[in-house]
């Protein structure tokens, strides 16, 4: 289905240890995490909170297991803080990823975000940007995009539950007000369906701008409980709203077909944060790998 050597398969460490809730998977070590990724048949990983920041140490650990770094999350605060603060941290992050051989930097605006707040209802309190904030976001992303390209990288914007860029309309707004040469899009199946969006619409409309893909599934019965009981994003994660592709309600066949017939080259990263005490990360990594092999021929 996919052209040879166009797709690399990664998996996010958040299934082993959760950066937002460190108590989830606190017992799982960095070495266990990356060893199980490799054993499950993946080529790479994004970066978690237990990963060494020393690139020499990290490279050695990954090379022993034939793994690479696909990318790493970067929180921007372009709508709420001076640009200089974000830029200073971004340059360090960019240089780290450049040293690790990554080609994309995952960015997500966290100004006014509720994704990290345990007791704030997700669907009732989602932030909505003002026009001034949209302009600050676009200008800031253009600046970061140029900084990324100085080292041969691209920024990919991660639409995300509980943030100001979550819905179809918000993604469209962001794409409309940003330069496609500087700001690319991360396509995340799980966050789109969780929000009630139509992922194929976003995929088809912005295919040329998509430079990174997160494969994530959802358990609809848990999402329904999140809405009914007015739970937060973190409570949704703890209750099992997300799971690996093939274990939830999302249909991936057409997603894979569209991407296979496109010029997309890069990573597919399985990202499914759930409680590792309830969903064994290695078992679920194997499930995801088998599903991708079966459905995408990869």
Curated annotation (Swiss-Prot):
Cofactor: glutathione; Co(2+); Mn(2+)
GO biological process, one term: inositol catabolic process
This enzyme's EC code(s): 4.2.1.44
Keywords assigned: Cobalt, Lyase, Manganese
Enzyme class label: lyase
A GO molecular-function descriptor: manganese ion binding
Record field: catalytic activity: scyllo-inosose = 3D-3,5/4-trihydroxycyclohexane-1,2-dione + H2O
SUPFAM superfamilies according to UniProt: Xylose isomerase-like
InterPro entries tied to this protein: IolE, IolE/MocC, IolE/XylAMocC-like, Xyl_isomerase-like_sf, Xyl_isomerase-like_TIM-brl
Pathway membership: Polyol metabolism; myo-inositol degradation into acetyl-CoA; acetyl-CoA from myo-inositol: step 2/7
UniProt-listed PANTHER family: HYDROXYPYRUVATE ISOMERASE (PTHR12110), INOSOSE DEHYDRATASE (PTHR12110:SF41)
Similarity annotation: Belongs to the IolE/MocC family.
Name of this protein: Inosose dehydratase
Organism: Bacillus thuringiensis (strain Al Hakam)
Lineage: Bacteria, Bacillati, Bacillota, Bacilli, Bacillales
């Amino acid at each position: 289905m996919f052209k040879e050597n166009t797709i690399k398969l990664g998996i996010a460490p958040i299934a082993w240890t959760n950066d937002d809730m460190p108590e989830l998977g606190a017992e799982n070590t960095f070495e266990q995490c990356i060893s199980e990724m490799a054993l499950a048949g993946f080529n790479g990983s994004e970066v978690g909170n237990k990963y060494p920041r020393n690139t020499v140490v990290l490279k050695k650990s990954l090379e022993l297991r034939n793994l690479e770094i696909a990318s790493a999350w970067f929180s921007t605060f372009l709508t709420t803080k001076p640009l200089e603060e974000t830029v200073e941290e971004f340059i360090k992050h960019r240089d780290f990823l450049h040293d690790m051989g990554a080609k994309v930097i995952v960015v997500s605006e966290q100004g006014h975000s509720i994704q990290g707040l345990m007791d704030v209802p997700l669907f009732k309190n989602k932030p909505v940007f003002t026009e001034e904030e949209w302009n600050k976001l676009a200008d800031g992303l253009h600046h970061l995009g140029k900084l990324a390209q100085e080292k041969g990288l691209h920024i990919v914007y991660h639409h995300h539950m509980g943030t100001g860029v979550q819905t179809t309309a918000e993604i469209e707004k962001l794409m409309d007000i940003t330069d496609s040469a500087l700001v690319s899009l991360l396509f995340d199946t799980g966050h789109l369906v969780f929000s009630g969006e139509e992922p194929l619409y976003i995929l088809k409309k912005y295919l040329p701008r998509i430079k990174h893909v997160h494969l994530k599934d959802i358990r609809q019965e848990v999402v329904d409980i999140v809405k009914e009981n007015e739970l937060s994003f973190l409570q949704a994660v703890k209750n099992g709203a997300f799971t690996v592709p093939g274990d939830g309600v999302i249909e991936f066949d057409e997603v894979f077909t569209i991407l296979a017939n496109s010029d997309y080259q890069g990573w597919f990263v399985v990202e499914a944060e759930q409680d590792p005490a309830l969903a064994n990360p290695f078992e679920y990594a194997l499930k995801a790998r088998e599903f991708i092999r079966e459905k995408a021929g990869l």
